[in-house]
UniProtKB/Swiss-Prot annotation:
Family annotation (HAMAP family): Ribosomal_uL2_B
Any one Gene Ontology cellular component term annotated for this protein: chloroplast
Keyword Chloroplast assigned: yes
Main location as per UniProt: plastid
Swiss-Prot/TrEMBL keywords: Chloroplast, Plastid, Ribonucleoprotein, Ribosomal protein
SUPFAM superfamilies to which the protein is assigned, alphabetical: Nucleic acid-binding proteins (SSF50249), Translation proteins SH3-like domain (SSF50104)
Example GO BP: mitochondrial translation
Listed name of the protein: Large ribosomal subunit protein uL2cz/uL2cy
Region (Disordered): 224-274
GO molecular function, one term: transferase activity
Source organism, top-level taxon: Eukaryota
Ribosomal protein keyword on record: yes
Source organism: Morus indica
Gene behind this protein: rpl2-A
Subunit composition and interactions: Part of the 50S ribosomal subunit.
Length: 274
């Protein structure tokens, strides 16, 4: 990612950075408007996702997570910014005339060709089933259910590793450190998702974060009782409980929050590292 550092002319630009090489110029037939209502609240106005609100209007880009244009070569035409995710996207022109957006693989350049299918080369950006990949391949945009499209390792810089194949399942090490089983006939894309250094980019000021729809993060004790169990009281008050709690009232320190007897428990060989 080519980072442009602002010249220090004001306090807000002292540590600000932006990527000047990637711009947004979406195609009209691959975008549509979305109604963002609530901004982190449900129908009753209760906060269900904290620290959300405001932000600039967005148009949703239709991303091809299925990669079902089989055995048809496509050419990367543009690399664009997507306001709905922290990874970049690239526009693909396929040989049959189809045009689609996909996640930008790290290192892919304008003019490169990609393809998806069963017997395609192990090349960055190509999509193929796990059965046709050698062990140790770095992959992203991984299917969990055949034909449903990629659901794992889609964030900026995300990459998983194929470490074993046995029977009808393949063993993957996910970006979180979790090791789990995936059906071997599911597809994935070779390589790592681009925009790796996005978590190291400094926005420089609070207003830039507001444009992204992110509100300030504050402690629970300074909230109202309707928003957090620690809230309320006269002036500076203790939490009023024996132990800290989450905004939904569950124990905050150490208790596992994963649902018991979940269907995927048998597929997880090692829990994710915290």
């Amino acid at each position: 990612m080519a980072i442009h550092l602002y010249k220090t002319s004001t306090p807000s630009t002292r540590k600000g950075a932006v990527d000047r090489q990637v711009k947004s110029n979406p195609r009209n037939n691959l975008i549509y408007g979305q109604h963002r209502c609530g901004k982190g609240r449900n129908a009753r106005g209760i906060i269900t996702a904290g620290h959300r609100g405001g932000g600039h209007k967005r148009l949703y880009r239709k991303i091809d997570f299925r990669r079902n244009e089989k055995d048809i070569y496509g050419k990367i035409v543009t690399i664009e910014y997507d306001p709905n995710r922290n990874a970049y996207i690239c526009l693909i022109h396929y040989g049959g005339g189809e045009k689609r957006y996909i996640l930008h693989p790290r290192g892919a350049l304008i003019g490169d060709t990609i393809v998806s299918g069963t017997e395609v080369p192990i090349k960055m950006g190509n999509a193929l089933p796990l059965t046709d990949m050698p062990l140790g391949t770095a992959i992203h945009n991984i299917e969990i259910t055949l034909g449903k499209g990629g659901q794992l390792a889609r964030a900026a810089g995300a990459v998983a590793k194929l470490i074993a194949k046995e029977g009808k399942s393949a063993t993957l090490k996910l970006p979180s450190g979790e090791v789990r089983l995936i059906p071997k006939n599911c597809s994935a894309t070779v390589g790592q998702v681009g925009n790796v250094g996005v978590n190291q980019k400094s926005l420089g000021r609070a207003g830039s974060k507001c444009w992204l729809g992110k509100r300030p993060v504050v402690r629970g004790v300074v909230m109202n009782p309707v928003d957090h169990p620690h809230g309320g009281g006269e002036g500076r008050a203790p939490i009023g409980r024996k132990k800290p709690a989450t905004p939904w009232g569950y124990p905050a320190l150490g208790r596992r929050s994963r649902k018991r007897n979940k269907y995927s428990d048998n597929l997880i060989l090692r829990r994710r590292s915290k």
